[in-house]
Amino acid sequence: MNSHIHTAAQKLAQGEVIALPTETVYGLAADASNSAAVAQIFALKNRPTNHPLITHISADADIGYWIDASRMSDEIWRLTNALMAAFFPGPLTLVLPKHPRIDASVTGGQDTIALRSPNQAVFQDVLSELARIKNTLNVGIAAPSANKFGRVSPTHAEHVRAEFGDAVWVLDGDASVIGIESTIVDLTSGVPRILRFGHVTPNDIERVTGIVPILPERMGSDVPRVSGSLLAHYAPTTPMVWSSAENINETSRVALYHSDDFALQDYEQAIRLPNNAIGYARGLYHALRTLDGYAAEQIVVETLPNDEAWYAVRDRLNRAVVGSHLSSHLGQNKLNKSEK
């Protein structure tokens, strides 16, 4: 066994918070059964304690340990089994009724739990080693993205180190191959409700379940709180604005674009991402961190296609645009106060 795997699992078993790679983004990880360790996650991230975490489990885990079967109808079981067969392990998180034994600190005080099994060998190996050390199969790792709350998620080990320095031990598992957070689907009503867009699309969910999922804009307020659902999120410190492709050449010194029919030849601080949603998502957060490092007045982002394949990327960038302006405003207020 890789000694780093054992070290990671040992640190988790001892109640430490570490950073682990997944196929989506790097996570700030703690033993989900250790409420003190989970509290450290919230403190390190400056994350509100009512903002629930995703619990990551092994590919062959018994979900019966984590969920309240008495609140699972036959239809909820059917949906759960179908989606797990298709996407566990993978970039899908399921929201289900929480078993009373699960500490409320992981779930933000809610009676639901968010479960995912990462499709990442290093993470799965850490889960297996943690189970061996603790001598139980019922292990879970709580792991939100390894960044300060509301900021750009990390997809490389160096992103985490830049965020937390020596305060967090990082297990380097190379770059995240998907690059954005998992799709979150709430099954507690017996109908799939997408709470966060991700790599798994609404069409994917319909194909597997036979049901057209309810999209976020069609829901009321009676849905569980979940990671990444705030209006302002995933944000750099530099203000971001949308722009059409034809206007980017005229307005931009720092830009993020994808069109194939032009190039920003004279703009060293422009990044072109692939002109497809999967490739764009894979490079998005690394590109935002790079552009943010230029400390420009603004980052101009080329508008994206409106089809389903781009839902998740558009969602992240829409929230980043809002969050970047809030971040810039707060930063200016701090500067003004320091000058008084």
What are these regions (language model features)?
Residues 1-340:
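Active-site-adjacent structural elements in enzyme catalytic cores
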